[in-house]
Amino acid sequence: MKLNIKLSHSLAACLFGFSSLIYSQSEDQITNFTKAAKFDDIFEVKSLIKAGVSPNTLDPKGNPMLFLAVKENSSKVIDYLTNLPSIDINLPNKSGETPLMIASIEGNLPVVKYLVLTKKADVNNSGWTPLQYACTRGHLEVAEFLVTNGAKVNALSPNNSTALMMSVMSGNEYLVKYLLDNGADLKMRNQQGLTAIDFADIYTKPWIGEGLRSRWAKLYKSTYPEAPSRGPTN
């Protein structure tokens, strides 16, 4: 028994040591990986992975290489990294942003579809969500796809903002209507006590504010109770 325990410990030590060798990388390798991910240099990326660099390596700013590739729409690097067995599709950067989130805010529908349908990326991660990011810039088609594939319309951001509030801020009235027609709650307030209607006022979207007030009156049989105080929100 003692012999077996010693052998087990030795084996574990060897495995952990081997693992550290597999995923060790120098500063130069990280720098080269960062450039390659941004500029879609698939040959350099393959060379680095073959040399033992982890596909989940972070750049000096805390961004995963897949995140960088998605942000720059480096299609060959995206395809290669996402097909590596050890890749973490949902690995966030230090701000909590995932590759799917950056694809969503950029309005890159083909990459969004690929990450969700083929790679099963999480559409409802904690913190800010891909849907909220898409709505921030008014990307209707991305939002429609995410909702169709399970994104929670009324999910709360860290400051309790919603996708509806973000869509109002973007000024895309078609996106606002889509979210409302798919269950967005007009009564929800963020940590500052602001609703989507307040967002329309703060971000000077009067055409949206008018429509939302009309919808409020129809839904709740009353006029919208104006907020006692207003201010910019995060």
Feature-to-residue mapping (PLM):
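Ankyrin-repeat-protein effector appendages
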Residues: 24-33, 149, 182, 191-234
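Ankyrin repeat A-helix N-terminal signature
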Residues: 35-40, 68-74, 102-108, 133-139, ...
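Ankyrin repeat structural motif
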Residues: 41-49, 74-83, 108-117, 139-147, ...
